[in-house]
Amino acid sequence: MEQIEQHILRLRKQLRHWEYLYYVEAAPEVPDSEYDRFMAELRTLEAERPDLLTADSPSQRVGGQAQSSFGQVRHEVPMLSLDNVFEEPGFLAFDKRVRDRLKRDDDMTYCCELKLDGLAVSLLYENGELVRAATRGDGATGEDITANVRTIRTIPLRLQDHDNLPRLLEIRGEVFMSEAGFLRLNETAKREGSKVFANPRNAAAGSLRQLDPSITARRPLTFYCYGVGLLEDGELPESHWERLQQFKAWGVPVSDRVRRCTGSAAVLDFYRQVHEARLSLGFDIDGVVIKVDSLALQQRLGFVARAPRWAIAYKFPAQEQLTRVRDVEFQVGRTGAITPVARLEPVLVSGAMVSNATLHNADEVERLGLMIGDTVIVRRAGDVIPQIVGVVTSERPAEVRPVAFPTQCPVCSSDVERVEGEAVLRCTAGLVCAAQRKEALKHFVSRRAMDIDGMGDKIIDQLVERELVKTPADLFRLNKEILTRLDRMGSKSAQNLLEALEKARQTTFARFLYALGIREVGEATAVNLAAAYGTLDALIAADIDSLTGVQDIGNIVATHVRHFFEETHNIEVIQDLLSPAIGIRWPEPVAAPVAASDNPFAGKTIVLTGSLSSLSRDEAKDHLVALGARVSGSVSAKTDLLIAGEAAGSKLSKAQQLNIPVMDEAEMMRLLGESSDA
């Protein structure tokens, strides 16, 4: 070996060592100037001898040319998601399921890790050298982000030398951004007039998907390993915890907050400690991941619903923040319900900026004791929907004022009423009210109703505000000249919308009923009504006694249906829609679904949860309903079956607690295929 080649190898080895100490261990050994001197010498030598330049050299981190797109990467070992639990009983139920399946009475040993709030990635090392990096994608196929990942300082381009390196090793983990790095990034973006990110997770994801790797190189990204995928021509320990220690020895970053726990009590103790310390970690986490430590036991437990039976994510309760109520405004919905909405001083809650929260009704405002100007506790229910959970009365200023509910509709000034037995106020004007008209039309054109593609909320708003549309039938009277006068509506878009309107004229009885917007009549109820009566005339003639005999329809829903068809205006709207000029039609009569004796879905109440890869949730729902199932949106003791797709959450946990049978997507698709062939 030449002397210059030996010197280059020594420089690379020294620089890798210093990078590991600086970026992974946070324990720099030399001043930056010394590191820079070695790096400059390495680059000079590599420039002199380009034949000695290798992809894993420390000099090659900061990316080169921009890409035009990301290539696709098929994961040899699928990157599965985890089932979630949100409360202690959910974890204890998981622990019991594990022990029951393994037929063990003794305590299980688990490896507990932080659930990082970043982006899952796969790192493929060949003979210790990083050769490919990919996003998780849909679990089966991800995007090739090798050029960008090579710029992340905490990810080794070459594993530290050891005799036992596998030929192929796929390390999996999370790329994320620290809170301090996120704040610095946004401060710089503000100064430069660039995009400001909402939260560290979005910043990390956006940084990894830059087509120009030099941009990624300037982003403060870091990485923690949490597992392994593909492994060829090599061996690893049979304990997950010991595997993480092995990866750490090879120079791969592993969180120092990984603990091996024996028994559920030890796991719960670790969870509580992490929950208390979460705000001091310096980066976002949203729970603890709990894995059976033994690889042999993991293999025995296997997988279900595209998630392992041997692991669970125990997520933290929704994060809460304090903010102030600036005002309370009132919104009018499709059925005239007047809903109070709190306007808040913007506050970051669980990674999202929150400035509004619904207060539901007067009873909720009274229960909270809320006044305008109050300091309130805000959380995002399920880390999604903002809600006010309490008022900090000790912080109440002198100038607060009560929430005054309107006596007239805030949109059309019509009288409002509160029906006995209901908590909400309602505008009495019906579709005369512009707000109700807008919301009714938005419902009518929605995907699960008449499915008029391209007829978005902003188009409906313009049509109503310009008094171009008053009833659903008016939508079908629109022409290209009218549409092109709307904002942001060109000739091509107008033509596409007219074609969508034409297509929507052919529908189904159930969709049409749902589109009418009858109170309390959702998709499943509309299907049941269509199946029970077959024709619109028969349904219109049905009395309350007849209606209450239909599956899942009680007295309240029956009363709403009866009242809807007793309104002259509603009958006029229906007649207009069905007239030859408009031409809404569907196959008649609609017969009740006939369930084959061997159809496993007939007569069952089924809940769908998680995302499906073979078809959409809506398509799955249509198939199940066609086979005589009732598809519900929530799990209860009356649920017969839960079908769990990828990333199934609290519904899966509740079903398991209630001992409700769970079916994965593959089994559902198999049975749907058999039922359709029958």
UniProtKB/Swiss-Prot annotation:
DNA ligase that catalyzes the formation of phosphodiester linkages between 5'-phosphoryl and 3'-hydroxyl groups in double-stranded DNA using NAD as a coenzyme and as the energy source for the reaction. It is essential for DNA replication and repair of damaged DNA. SMART domains: BRCT, HhH1, LIGANc. Zn(2+) binds at C409, C412, C427, C433. The keyword DNA damage applies. Its EC number is 6.5.1.2. One of its GO terms (molecular function) is DNA ligase (NAD+) activity. The active site is at K115. Belongs to the NAD-dependent DNA ligase family. LigA subfamily. Keywords: DNA damage, DNA repair, DNA replication, Ligase, Magnesium, Manganese, Metal-binding, NAD, Zinc. It is an enzyme of class 6 (ligase). The keyword DNA damage applies. It catalyses: NAD(+) + (deoxyribonucleotide)n-3'-hydroxyl + 5'-phospho-(deoxyribonucleotide)m = (deoxyribonucleotide)n+m + AMP + beta-nicotinamide D-nucleotide. This is DNA ligase. Its cofactor is Mg(2+); Mn(2+). It comes from the Bacteria. InterPro entries: BRCT_dom, BRCT_dom_sf, DisA/LigA_HHH, DNA_ligase, DNA_ligase_AS, DNA_ligase_CS, DNAligase_adenylation, DNAligase_N. NAD(+) binds at D32, S33, E34, Y35, D36, S81, L82, E113, R136, E174, K291, K315. One of its GO terms (biological process) is DNA replication.
